[in-house]
Regions:
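Hydrophobic beta-strand-centered segment that forms part of the acyl-chain substrate-binding groove
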Residues: 272-281, 308-317, 383-420, 447, ...
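C-terminal regulatory domains involved in ligand/effector binding and gene-expression control
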Residues: 1-88, 93-310
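Active-site helix/loop of acyl-thioester processing domains in fatty-acid/polyketide metabolism
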Residues: 258-271, 339, 369-394
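Short Pro/Gly-enriched beta-strand edge/turn motifs at strand-loop
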Residues: 5-9, 317-323, 420-421
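Flexible glycine-rich active-site/ligand-binding loops centered on an Asp-His dyad
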Residues: 171-189, 370, 440-448, 452-460
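Residues located in well-ordered beta-strands
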Residues: 335-338, 403, 408, 422-424, ...
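Extracellular/lumenal ectodomain signal focusing on beta-strand-rich modules
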Residues: 89, 278, 337-341, 406, ...
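Non-catalytic linker/capping segments at the edges of enzyme domains
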Residues: 302-369, 396-398, 413-414, 426-428, ...
């Protein structure tokens, strides 16, 4: 799968939730490996902030990115839409300290993205595949986010509002392609008990019933409720009647929890990579979301080079017989048993190392270790299959080494190991010459790596 960006630019205008300012945000296409960057075009020098978890400086009433004295808030809805629709690279330009709140959901962003279209780029999409359970908890609030291994990204949010009229809810998104219809229209919400402190803090100047669901879930005095109704410019209501205060009906009964899921995706966008895993978020909020995103970035840095996923129960893309049709190598020099994944620019091969390998007779009889040069040879054979797979009549061509660079051996390979070869093209095949980067894994660990240049030559 390839990285994606927008086919063109688009602009949205509206007021800021907290500042009440009239704001404009423009979404622009960006080059490969650019990621999400946000630019304050109203400030001298037009500073740019990378949209990553470490740059979050506040999570009290939304996600606020910062760099020095520069701040950009309420970014989560825009990033949620980009991330869910598979956009990897985008430059967002805003003319103020926050994004416009629009209708309190992500639906306007989704509509505009779909309107301008999505463009596939050449670079491969760099997924991070979850291999083990990762969990972040806040004992005080009871918030918890857990991510488990899964083949695709899916999310479940569970919220407990501890109210007589709204208690526990959950929302699930098993298929990210359903985001536009099932999650994007869910609006932000606020409790009546929180409105007065927010107003006293000089916030929510742009908040109204057109961009938020207001929940009156705990009874207060009639006098206080009337005062808040006047602030919101809505009709007075009986203080004994709990419920929603809104202009528009709920889109779904669990709209508030769906919006929490929308926010989780927006804060996940700050991880910087698309994720394959199942997220379960209990009582999520921007603070725990950001802690989770930071933890994920630490985990990714620890496994900068990630081993391919291998399920021995799945049938291979190419078995040993098909490999023999492509490669001239035979016993004892055929060093790839099967291919489990192949695409235009990458390939994954497998070799099972047994005690019967002929090279163990001399390397070394008392302590059998696979020679490093044979690991490189096996990597190159895998890369050769990748290159040959891109030409017509591959059986009529052979691959030859031209150069090997950056060879590193990190760990011994011994009988019983299963080797995974991951090889990626560094540049397209030109004039029969290709550059590739290869890794050999045992389990999750890299045991060797190399960069090599090879040439395909037609057989005589």
């Amino acid at each position: 799968m390839k990285q994606k960006t927008l086919k063109g630019s688009f602009t949205l205008c509206g007021k800021g939730l907290h500042t009440g300012l009239s704001l404009t945000v423009t979404f622009n296409p960006a080059p490969e490996n650019h990621g999400y960057k946000i630019q304050r075009i109203d400030i001298d020098g037009m500073p740019v902030i990378d949209a990553v978890a470490e740059n979050v400086v506040d999570t009290q009433r939304g996600t606020v990115l910062g760099k020095g004295d520069i701040r950009i808030s309420t970014v989560e809805h825009a990033l949620s839409a980009l991330y869910a629709l598979g956009i990897d690279n985008c430059l967002l330009q805003v003319n103020g300290p926050e994004f416009p709140i629009l209708d309190g959901s992500a639906v306007k962003y989704v509509e505009k993205i779909q309107e301008v279209g999505i463009e596939e780029q050449n670079a491969p999409k760099d997924f991070y595949v979850i291999r083990k359970k990762i969990e972040v908890k806040d004992e005080e609030s009871g918030s918890c986010i857990t991510i488990l291994p899964d083949e695709e990204m899916s999310l479940t949010t569970m919220c407990s509002f501890e109210s007589k009229f709204i208690n526990s809810q959950f929302a699930t998104l098993d298929d990210i392609s359903q985001y536009a219809a099932e999650i994007a229209p869910a609006r932000t919400f606020v409790f009546v008990r929180d409105i007065e402190p927010l107003l006293q803090a000089n916030l929510i100047k742009g908040g109204d019933l057109d961009n938020a669901i207001v929940m009156y879930e705990r009874q207060t005095t009639q006098e206080r409720l009337d005062m808040l109704a006047d602030m919101l410019h809505v009709e007075h209501r009986d203080a004994t009647e709990l419920g929603y205060i809104q202009h528009k009906p709920l889109v779904w009964e669990n709209e508030c929890t769906r919006h929490k899921l929308l926010d989780v995706i927006g804060d996940m966008a700050l991880i910087g990579k698309p994720i394959k895993g199942r997220i379960i978020a209990t009582r999520p909020g921007h603070t725990i979301n950001n802690r989770f995103a930071r933890e994920m970035r630490k985990e990714i840095r620890k496994h900068e080079i990630q081993a391919p996923f291998y399920d021995p129960n799945e049938p291979p893309v190419m078995d040993v017989n098909r490999i023999r049709e492509l490669l001239p190598h035979r016993y004892p020099m055929q060093l790839v048993d099967k291919i489990i994944e192949i695409g235009p620019t990458s390939i994954v091969g497998v070799k099972n190392i047994t005690a019967n390998e002929p090279f163990f007779q001399g390397h070394f009889p008392q302590e059998p270790v696979m020679p490093g040069v044979l690991q490189i040879e096996a990597m190159a054979q895998t890369g050769g299959i990748l290159v040959l797979n891109s030409v017509e009549e591959p059986e009529r061509w052979s691959t030859y080494f031209m150069k090997i660079d950056g060879v590193k051996f990190r760990q011994k390979v011994v009988p019983g190991d299963t080797l995974l070869f991951k090889v990626e093209l560094l540049a397209p095949l030109r004039h029969g010459i290709s550059s590739m980067k290869g890794y050999v894994f045992v389990g999750d660990k890299v045991v060797s790596e190399a960069t090599f240049t090879a040439q395909i030559v037609k057989n005589k």
